[in-house]
Amino acid sequence: MPLPTVVLRRLVSAGTALSALSALLAATAAAAAPQPLRFVLIPKVSHLWYDVVREGAEAAGAMIRQQTGRLTQIDYQPPARSEVELQAEILKEAIRSRPSGIMIDLLDAPRLRPLLEQARRQGIPVNLFDSEPPDGLPLTSIGNDFCKQARIASQRLVERLGGKGEVAIMQGVPTAPNHAIRVRCHQEVFARHPGIKVVATPIDQDSIAIAQQQALATMRLHPQLRGWVVADAGGGIGIGRALQTLGRAGQVQVVGIDDLPEMMQLIRAGVVDSTSATKPRAQGYWSILNLWQQGLSAPTIERIDTGIVVEGPASRGG
């Protein structure tokens, strides 16, 4: 027997009300759900060293998800080349996208300062890893004492050479704060030893391939060269490859920076003496935690020092 029209109307009305209530409850639940976090990681260039930084950042993101239930994305944005113009464009786009935070390894602190200030004005948490802030700009720096790291390396080279001989410094990216500090501190150590003469300071632009090319050219131009120090992670690897190409492994002393797998292989093979290394995974991890805490209105701190480790015979006093 068909239901009366009035009953049908009441059923339809009840169904509509239930649908509206369900939609309202779903919207309320969605609004109450924690919003995802997105942190932008901007290195100097695509590089194996930054892959390790990224691993540390991802580990911190996983910890935040575990503790808060919030989805956390690490948006890795490397410039195609280590050029400040490219890094500036990436930073501009990152600011426009209104992320939960930006961590950046500066290619040129003064030139990027206006963009860093813009991000701060817009309330976007920002910090620097493996770098130093522009003068007077209160940003947290996550990394190590770059001057101490360089002094460890250059003093080791002086000892290996008995305080005498021609040496060269591979510069990395001269405008990058950490590279510039290392070069200056290498030079300060060598200046205290009259028997040491710096004959070349080539630039590798944070590229292993360019470091190899520059090292080959430098050693052909200076056949009496006895030793190398570097300002970046790829420099020592490129020099090691050049020594192998020239058949001069063991004849020219090299003290590197950082402990990428190929660097450690070169040390084990006796091509590179030792290395004064940063801790890139720790830098990535603590950079993300610092950005997250900034988003929770934590006060700004000046520095998070992730330390230095010496690898190779120098670590054993050999």
What is each residue range found by the language model?
Residues 7-13:
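N-terminal export leaders
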Residues 38-61, 75-88, 105-109, 171-180, ...:
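Extracytoplasmic "Venus flytrap"
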Residues 52-65, 149-153, 177-196, 210, ...:
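Short, solvent-exposed amphipathic alpha-helices that sit
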Residues 63-81, 166-171, 187-208:
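Short beta-strand elements in bilobed, periplasmic/extracellular small-molecule ligand-binding domains
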Residues 87, 142-167, 209-212, 259-263, ...:
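Hydrophobic alpha-helical segments within soluble ligand-binding/sensing domains
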Residues 101-120, 186, 200, 204-265:
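Hydrophobic alpha-helical
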